[in-house]
């Protein structure tokens, strides 16, 4: 239990002082001889008696006493009145007692329980009021008895009266403060309760309660059986069969274009149904990466038997027969759950036949060790499509038997790959028929094998095409391939070397000497090259222009083509194809005319960066002009016969020249160096139109080459990649 050092502490201090003052007044004479309430002529008066100061005698202590009768002149009241009032001096001890009780109550106000109780403070306040009245009464008695001879003992009672009054005020303030706090707390509590009540009411109103009438008494789970027959095919097991009428087309079931519903399959004939096809989970990946039947249809698409399997079987497993029909003739019973070809060319196999297989001429069966061989030794003969029908097998347009598709089929190499077309040549071999140009139309071309047997172009053999073949009447005749069959005979490559002379003589436009010509297959683009061939005897065109610049449209040399080069050199032929280098050059030919100033210009930005040509004299030529008939410089003379260049017209010794060192067939007499031909004596004929730095000055006389022939072209003019002033 502790004290609260608040307003109760001040109250306690005030009451203690008031109690002390009153106690001093009560302890006056005759209790003590020093403290008196009043004095008159050698007598001192107190609460309980009086004392004579001179002789030191005191009256017995008691309530009320009789004053000295001898001298009544000194007091305001007569002696009888003063004797009655002397009995009221007993109020001093009573007032002191009340003050003591109030002091104790003020001390208890420091305790937690009484201090927080407004009733306790109210009791203290009520008790302080009589205490104050008693103290005030004691002071009044003193004044009546001892005035005008009141001593200091009477004045301290006045001080005690004032302090008791102050303590009453403090008690009132304390109670008011406590009551205010309690009222404030109560108000706060009431406000909080109201807010909480409002919140609770709002929270309760946010819930909606359903009545018991809307709540079902129990839950019911119903199972409804669907009678929709359109969904029956989606739940068919894998071993079930769906039979269709003969010739009825259900839908496209090819792996190349499968639909969403693959539960029904086509029937090739009305003899035997097929097993349902399962959709491969890798269909989309195969369609994205490869085209259907990239290497052609597999041999096991055509119901052919192989080692360990009968006809129409699937790798040793007999075909599945219908549950309500007999087994086809020549076949044994099939086990449960087996899948076979069922005499249906639409069957693609389990993995769409992605394994590559080698090609070969008809009769080799194009068998693969992974897919089984056809017509193995001692095995059952193949059961192909022609045995199932009375007439010849008919395939739709664009569909071919396995192994008989052309090599350059657009479907062979996959999407985005364009095969290079083969050049059709006119064979010069006796007995070979010329190849006619292709006939315009939608039918694909044919392909001829090495053995000379024509075979149709297969193209993209998909199951859609097989379905079309299944719908075709069996007695219909097959469509003949456009353009007819072509028979090519094999001719060794070296045999064409002996035929080049005959072909050259046969295809030559007119007899006569021909200028020296180069193989232009390796020439690069030159905008100054002439479009027309050089005339015989033209020295400047054959030497300056033709040797270094060449012509745009030169015939393909006969020595580099195996056979039938006439179709290539003939521009009017539909099979004419310009050389690749010519196509490359034509793509860079400027549309506008080229200025002649480019002939003396250079790509170098400064003259100091250009090489010095000591033999270049500008457009005016060397001083003194050119000498007619001057021989070429030593570096332009031809090599000796034993060091021939080995070209087609140079006659080298055992270097692969034409006719092994013999004279070239088109070699003719060349005009003398520096002139000899009409219009070729100009000094500008020696200028190379491509670059002035490559010009050279002719010599004044010509020395015959060692071991050479007159008119032989110098070695430096064989190609512009050779010589001291090469164009590279």
Swiss-Prot record:
The chain crosses the membrane at residues 11-31, 88-108, 121-141, 154-174. It is found in: Cell membrane. GO terms for cellular component: cell division site; growing cell tip; plasma membrane. Residues 644-660 have a biased composition (Gly residues). Keywords: Cell membrane, Membrane, Transmembrane, Transmembrane helix. Residues 32-87, 142-153 are extracellular. Residues 319-332, 630-642, 662-672 have a biased composition (Pro residues). Residues 333-355, 362-372 have a biased composition (Low complexity). Residues 274-292 have a biased composition (Basic and acidic residues). Belongs to the palI/RIM9 family. Required for the proteolytic cleavage of the transcription factor RIM101 in response to alkaline ambient pH. This is pH-response regulator protein palI/RIM9. It comes from Yarrowia lipolytica (strain CLIB 122 / E 150).
